[in-house]
């Protein structure tokens, strides 16, 4: 797994390369990260990467040539390692919403090249010539694509075998297919009673079937309350059991009473 990032701020990526579980995995060689500054691919003394927009308007636009040259260098470096050409992902408000399914797909591949835009955006001709995918974190605007790229890489890298100490941890994440795309249940640790609030009794029972059912019901309860569209999606995909449906019907009755 190799990620390449085209960015004006390569130092920002030390956060995912050097810290936490992703940093440990990087040190172990489970994935690699290479940053490419488009200023290194300019032809003028000022290392210019942006210019005024045609048609007028506020702000500046990132120029196509330095970005395309940086992508070409990244693809060449990948080819030298025997890797196939990578998808080129532009972080953009116009992109498809990144989710756990996208992270899983990304983790199953050999990596990607992320384009981190700045200013008002990037020249459309670069997008049409080089970009294969556009992705977004959500309906809000950041100062640049770096934070989005960090989040997307973190979500994908933690799914790689050997990255997490317990390989089953990722299976219990919210939105994971192992949870049928639902939200995860609440978690508790020591002490058994905190500020007068005890750990729920089923978790102390040692009865694995009861614990599993309690967690499933709490997952259903939380998802129905916070993200009801995920319940409908799971239902439409046939992921809800008869016991799940009975519990949800009971929740609906509670809300009506």
UniProtKB/Swiss-Prot annotation:
It is found in: Cytoplasm. The gene is trmD. Keywords: Cytoplasm, Methyltransferase, S-adenosyl-L-methionine, Transferase, tRNA processing. It is an enzyme of class 2 (transferase). This is tRNA (guanine-N(1)-)-methyltransferase. S-adenosyl-L-methionine binds at residues 117, 137-142. Transmembrane segments: none annotated. It holds the Pfam family tRNA_m1G_MT.
């Amino acid at each position: 797994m190799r990620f390449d990032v085209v960015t004006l701020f390569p130092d920002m990526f030390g956060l995912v390369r050097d810290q936490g579980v992703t940093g440990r995995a990087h040190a172990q060689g489970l994935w690699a990260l290479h940053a490419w500054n488009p200023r290194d691919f300019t032809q003028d003394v000022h290392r210019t990467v942006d210019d005024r927009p045609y048609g007028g308007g506020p702000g500046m636009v990132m120029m196509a040539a330095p970005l395309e040259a940086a992508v070409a260098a990244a693809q060449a470096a990948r080819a030298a390692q025997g890797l196939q050409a990578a998808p080129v992902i532009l972080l953009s408000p116009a992109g498809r919403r990144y989710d756990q399914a996208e992270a899983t797909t990304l983790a199953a591949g050999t990596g990607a090249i992320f384009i981190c835009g700045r200013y008002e955006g990037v020249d459309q001709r670069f997008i049409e010539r080089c970009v294969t995918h556009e992705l977004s974190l959500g309906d809000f605007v950041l100062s640049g694509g770096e934070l989005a790229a960090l989040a997307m890489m973190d979500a994908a890298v933690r799914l790689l075998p050997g990255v997490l100490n317990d390989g089953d941890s990722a299976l219990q994440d919210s939105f994971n297919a192992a949870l049928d795309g639902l939200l995860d249940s609440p978690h508790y640790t020591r002490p058994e009673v905190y500020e007068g609030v005890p750990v729920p009794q089923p978790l102390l029972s040692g009865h694995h079937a009861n614990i599993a059912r309690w967690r499933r019901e709490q997952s259903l309860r939380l998802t129905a309350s916070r993200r009801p569209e995920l319940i409908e999606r799971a239902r439409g995909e046939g992921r809800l059991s008869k016991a799940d449906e009975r519990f949800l019907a009971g929740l609906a009755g509670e809300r009506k009473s």
